[in-house]
Amino acid sequence: MAKLTDLVGYQDGAVVSREIINQKSGSVTLFAFDEGQGLSEHMAPFDALVYLLDGEAEITISGKPLHLKQGEMVIMPANQPHSLKATKRFKMVLTMIKA
């Protein structure tokens, strides 16, 4: 048993990730973003669910910015450009199903 927020820690000026599950059928990865850090626009071939464990983030999907807070989630559709930025430090779990 584990608390997800305890499995990945913040680092100043960095994005930290920890893969929890990596199978042919999908993956679960934890991320910790320091304030101001992010991931530049990219696409993925599969739908991905993002759930914020802590903090606040701006997630832009196909040019539309969304502001998420702790406890909120969004689905990033396959083959749609998206980016993430920490408006405050935040932790998230990214679940990608590859089926």
What function would you assign to each model-found segment?
Residues 14, 29-44:
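Conserved short histidine dyad/triad with adjacent acidic residue
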Residues 1-25, 60:
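A short, N-terminal "cap"/entry segment at the start of jelly-roll beta-barrel domains
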Residues 32-34, 45-59:
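Short, conserved beta-strand element in jelly-roll/cupin
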Residues 78-99:
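Ligand-binding loop in jelly-roll beta-barrel domains
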Residues 27, 56-58, 65, 81, ...:
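Structural motif
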Residues 53-54, 69-70, 88:
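A cytosolic small-molecule/anion-sensing beta-strand core signal
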Residues 63-78:
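Short acidic-glycine-tyrosine-enriched beta hairpin
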